[in-house]
UniProtKB/Swiss-Prot annotation:
Residues 1-38, 991-1014 are annotated as: Disordered. GO terms for cellular component: membrane. Disulfide bonds: none annotated. It is found in: Membrane. The chain crosses the membrane at residues 117-137, 143-163, 177-197, 205-225, 228-248, 262-282, 661-681, 735-755, 760-780, 794-814. InterPro entries: Brefeldin_A-sensitivity_4 (IPR023244), IVT-Associated (IPR052430), Memb_transporter_dom (IPR049453). Keywords: Glycoprotein, Membrane, Protein transport, Transmembrane, Transmembrane helix, Transport. This is Protein BRE4. It is a multi-pass membrane protein. The gene is BRE4. The keyword Membrane applies. The lineage of its organism: Eukaryota, Fungi, Dikarya, Ascomycota, Saccharomycotina. Glycans are attached at N464, N469, N547, N647, N701, N1003. GO terms for biological process: endocytosis; protein transport. Residues 9-25 have a biased composition (Polar residues).
Length: 1053
């Protein structure tokens, strides 16, 4: 009976103890292998096996006895455990002495650099603010706009400042106008109710109800849908103003002119910011996205430069840093920049679809570089210096008509006697590396240099077409340059392919060479550079189309609405404060959605599970990878799931924040409704306390005492400056107030943009603007009246500002530290899903079910999203460090080390995914008996890793201690290799190994043909590197277990 791959119903090796006594009778079950010389049994696992044995011996673990019990049921697995040991405490990093104060010259240079970058933003911000102040200080204009309430005009300018792209500014202006209209409509309704049929005798209760409803709705809307925050703030400001500005005496008619005063002032502020944004240093997003692509190409070029630079080629830390920077440039900065571009109205010269294709093709081209072995030893200092000296003397070849690199070229080289001798003498490690270096170093150097030249040309071309005045002749020059790069790149790829074939036909692939880690790294390095170059040709082709389609066009937002509604533009997120947290939550939502989509996607070519089992009478069996194992949804009823989503949104954290926010808002407005205080509350404009509270509050800003001190200090400075502006000679002189505005606005604007102190600067400017203008409109200007008005209003602003931060410290508190545990839990879950996909879809995939284009595309999305999630979580750690230590000391170094291991784990998963698609693990087994014997052990290895991931994920999400007994991933994998080597030795002793009893290959495959032999060689290389990557995953996972126990604690301790 034929053994079905992936079926756990077959007997395991432990149940086949008589296998070693069967002699040669097992020969019919032997699977054909293709090369005796290059595929020794166990060679692809021997290096990893040796490493695991050393780790097991050196760690002092004591394996627990399993008494020979074996799990044979579907859906269960056997795990290997070690006796728990006390986790050694990780020493915190040595704290360095505080840095000495930078010299004055250095600080002046840093100041000049910041000024050179942000001077346009400072000018735009200052012009808009001063224009708003001038309109308020010119009495005829201010009387018509809104009289004393014209101070809403500069406040609206400050909230919606013009230093944004035109598309974003237009969007937030429309949002705020809608919020203003809704707020005035809502308030007009309640004012009408308060003035009809004597209902308004106790209008405070009605206004209280109005404010409660509006506060709940506006705060929930901003918390649930981040993109609508400006509509929510405008609605909240308007509703709060009208809830506290009713006439102070019962029976008085409402002053309906207040609707004109507040509405026109706020509207004029919105339109003024929009006009300044459009006409003064306008930004349409065109140059920004062009610079983003250019910067990403430059970072890739730097990595390749270091690889062929004699000074840095052996500097592994420098190369790792350049590699990480290149990965971050593509996966994070370029990706975020394109999302920013696609999420807004843009006036650009780029075609949106071609720009997306360029982003995707550049991401694919950079993907092999993140798994590039850096210690390959293929390029040495001496050779690089020699190649660089010889390169200027040889003119580059511009071959225009070159066939595609994937075409098969006839190799004219023949096996020389020298090559044969080299192949026989390839036993030395150094000699193996020298042979590969001799054959490939010059060719790969030329290919890397051509890649650098292509990236440089791409960077220059992007910079040129990003300019608004690029001419047709310049575009023609760009096209000619890119075509030359494309031709040269094809030629270099062809030469490398010829070298491949020469190397394979020379008989240099030997078992000794393959068992040399340096050799396998060098061969993988060649393949990854070749893949990068091949994908780079696609990048250049897309850029040629982009260059040919350059003309001005308007591109509307094309981001998916269900994701765009939660995404706030970068500048707006900075303005809201705690931009790290905004970025973290946006990234977390995108990553969760992407993983749910990917994890539940069926990419197999077998449309039904039963397609794998076409025989009659056989029930469908559980596959090696089942998407229902860890599905997010616990119900298949769509209506029930939608109801759960609705209930979660109404009663979730957003709703809790809305209730807490509204309680504080009502408390700040309460004096405006009480008979004993509502007169002075309106007279001294204390209604600005709840208004500034609405403006400054942020649900996801934990902050600390230092942030509170800075915000309050800014408020005191603003109030003091406002009193000084009115108290100066010629009381409340508009020219003096305008002068004071200029003197305050310029440094604060620089502080706003250059140092990203957004909320404290905004609070300072509002606390200057409101007291200055309110005092300016007083009928009587005396020293006492100016002091009383300015400081009474200022104290109200201080109270509202003070409440905007501690609200997050009490009742349903938000802290970055509590969120960090959930972030780590999510990362563990996503890493587990990625591991399961790699194991099920790549390593143990079904027969004739190779990963297709869809599978690879989803893998690329998954890897990019995980990289973004890791960086966002690192930013969350930095936010957690700034929080005060109240209950216990926060050990950030443990989370930093944990995330470092996550990063290594992710890179190994990416490496395993790239390698696993090139070989079939079942073909590495010598016979079907071995495959059947190893099925349960392979199941145990994968299932143990997944089980550990999910146990740790649940511990972090619930805050529970880590169980004392968890499977030891090193022991489980070592057990698999032990069994594999024992089977190989038994088969060799019986004389039934593939070396002596391999049946003839199928008729359609000639194992002696050069192409078949070359493929066998590369299969062996990929298998060795894959085994090493999967072993690294087990090693890293054991260290993650120890760190989790140190962070959360261990049960029983």
């Amino acid at each position: 009976m034929e053994v079905l791959k992936g079926s756990y119903k077959q007997k395991s090796f432990q149940s086949l103890k008589d296998l070693g006594q069967q002699g040669s009778s097992a020969a019919p079950g032997v699977r054909p292998t293709k090369s005796l010389q290059t595929s020794p049994i166990g060679s692809w696992t021997s290096l990893s096996h040796l490493r695991l044995e050393k780790l097991a011996e050196g760690s002092g673990w004591e394996e627990l006895q399993d008494y020979g019990l074996e799990e044979l049921r579907d859906g269960f697995f056997d795990a290997s455990y070690s006796r728990p040991q006390r986790v050694a405490a990780t020493e915190p990093p040595v704290s360095t002495s505080p840095k000495a104060q930078s010299p004055l010259a250095v600080r002046c240079k840093a100041f000049r650099d910041r000024l050179r970058v942000h001077w346009k933003a400072v000018v735009k911000f200052t012009v808009a603010y001063l224009a708003a102040m001038f309109l308020c200080l010119v009495r005829p204009a201010s009387d018509w706009i809104g009289d004393v309430y014209s101070c809403f005009l500069p406040v609206a300018v400050l909230i919606h400042h013009p230093v944004r792209t035109v598309g974003v500014q237009l969007e937030i202006t429309v949002q705020s106008i809608v919020g203003l209209a809704l707020g005035q409509g809502w308030s007009a309704l309640w004012w009408y109710v308060c003035s009809v049929a004597r209902v308004g005798r106790h209008e405070g209760a009605l206004l209280f109800l109005s404010l409660v409803l509006s506060g709940l709705w506006s705060s929930w809307l901003a918390a649930a849908y981040g993109r609508l925050v400006y509509m929510s703030v405008s609605f909240g400001i308007t509703a709060t103003f009208f809830a506290t500005s009713m006439p102070p005496s019962e029976g008085s008619l409402p002053i309906w002119r207040h609707f004109w005063d507040q509405g026109m002032s706020y509207l004029f502020g919105l339109l003024l910011s929009l006009l300044v944004c459009i006409f003064l240093f306008p930004r349409f997003g065109h140059a920004t996205i062009g610079r983003g692509f250019s910067s990403a190409a430059n970072d890739l070029k730097h990595l390749l430069d270091y690889l062929v630079d004699a000074r840095y080629c052996n500097d592994i830390p420098m190369l790792v840093e350049a590699q990480e920077n290149a990965v971050s440039a593509i996966d994070v900065r370029l990706s975020e920049g394109y999302r920013e571009f696609a999420n807004q109205f843009s006036i650009t010269r780029f075609d949106g679809k071609l720009l997306e294709q360029l982003r995707n093709s550049l991401t694919i081209a950079a993907s092999p570089l993140r798994s590039l072995p850096l210690g390959h030893g293929l390029l040495t200092n001496v050779e690089l210096e020699r190649f660089h000296q010889a390169r200027p003397q040889s003119a580059p070849e511009n071959t225009i008509c070159v066939r595609d690199a994937d075409d098969h070229y006839e190799d004219q080289a023949i096996k020389t006697e020298e090559s044969a001798n080299l192949g026989l003498a390839c036993g030395s490690t150094d000699l193996c590396s020298a042979i590969i270096r001799d054959k490939f170093s010059e060719t790969i150097f030329d290919l890397i240099m051509e890649l650098i030249h292509a990236l440089n040309s791409l960077q220059v071309g992007l910079n040129n077409i990003s300019e608004s005045n690029v001419s047709a002749s310049e575009r023609a020059d760009i096209k000619a340059n890119i075509l030359a790069c494309l031709s040269n790149l094809h030629d270099r790829i062809r030469r490398l392919d010829i070298k491949y074939k020469e190397f394979g036909r020379a008989g240099l692939f030997t078992s000794e060479l393959l068992l040399n880690p340096k050799s396998s790294d060098a061969l993988v390095f060649l393949r990854y550079i070749r893949q990068c170059a091949k994908h780079m040709t696609k990048v250049l082709e897309v850029f040629l189309q982009l260059n040919a389609s350059v003309h001005w066009r308007v591109i509307p937002p094309k981001y998916q609405w269900h994701r765009a509604i939660h995404r706030l533009s970068h500048q707006c997120a900075l303005d809201q404060g705690a931009s790290f947290l905004w970025n973290y939550f946006q990234t977390k939502r995108d990553v969760d959605d992407a993983f749910e989509m990917i994890y539940n996607s069926y990419t197999s070519k077998h449309h039904e599970v039963s397609d794998l089992f076409s025989r009659q009478g056989m029930r469908p069996r559980i596959r090696a990878f089942d998407h229902k194992d860890f599905a997010v949804h616990s119900t298949s009823n769509p209506i029930r799931y939608k109801l759960w989503q609705l209930n979660n949104s109404l009663l979730g954290p957003e709703s809790r924040w809305a209730r807490k926010f509204t309680v504080v808002l009502v408390a700040l407005c309460l004096p405006g409704w009480l008979p004993g205080s509502k007169v002075w509350y309106r007279e001294y404009h204390c209604l600005w306390a709840p208004i500034i509270y609405v403006i400054l509050s942020n649900r996801r800003n934990s902050s600390n005492w230092r942030a509170l001190y800075k915000r309050l200090a800014g408020c005191v400075l603003g109030v003091f400056w406002a009193w000084c502006a009115n108290q100066a000679k010629h009381y409340s002189n508009p020219f003096i107030i305008a002068t004071f505005s200029v003197l305050l606005c310029i440094p604060l604007a620089f502080n706003y943009f250059a140092y990203n102190r957004r909320k404290s600067t905004l609070a300072a400017l509002i606390c200057f603007t409101v007291p200055a203008l309110v005092t300016f409109f007083l009928e009587e200007h005396t020293t006492a009246s100016l002091w009383k008005q300015a400081w009474t209003t200022g104290v109200a602003l201080l109270i509202g500002t003070f409440c905007s931060i501690p609200i997050n410290w009490f009742i349903w508190t938000f802290t970055a530290r509590s969120e960090l545990s959930l972030a780590v839990s999510g990362l563990l879950m996503h890493l587990s899903q990625s591991y399961q996909i790699v194991a099920g879809r790549y390593l143990y995939r079904d027969t004739d079910d190779h990963p297709n284009d869809l599978t690879r595309s989803l893998a690329s999305i998954r890897e990019v999203r995980l990289s973004q999630s890791l960086l966002a979580t690192r930013a969350l750690v930095r936010s957690a460090v700034s929080e005060p230590n109240i209950v216990s000391e926060f050990r950030a170094y443990l989370f930093d080390e944990l995330l470092d291991h996550f990063s290594v784990l992710l890179e190994r998963l990416i490496e395993a995914r790239r390698l696993g698609q090139h070989f079939q693990v079942w073909d590495r087994d010598p016979n079907t008996e071995t495959t059947r014997a190893l099925l349960s052990l392979r199941r145990d290895n994968v299932a143990s890793v997944i089980f550990i991931f999910y146990m740790l994920s649940n511990c972090f999400s619930s805050g529970s201690k880590v169980p004392k007994y968890l499977p030891n991933p090193i022991f489980v994998r070592k057990k698999l290799f032990d069994t594999f080597m024992k089977l190989a030795e038994d088969a060799s002793a019986r004389g039934t190994s593939a070396h002596s009893s391999t049946p003839a290959a199928p008729n359609n495959t000639d194992p002696s043909s050069p192409s078949s032999a070359g493929q066998d060689h590369w299969d062996e290389v990929y298998a060795i590197c894959f085994s090493r990557a999967f072993t690294d995953i087990s090693v890293e996972l054991q260290r993650i277990i120890d760190l989790a126990k140190e962070i959360l604690g261990q049960e029983g301790d």
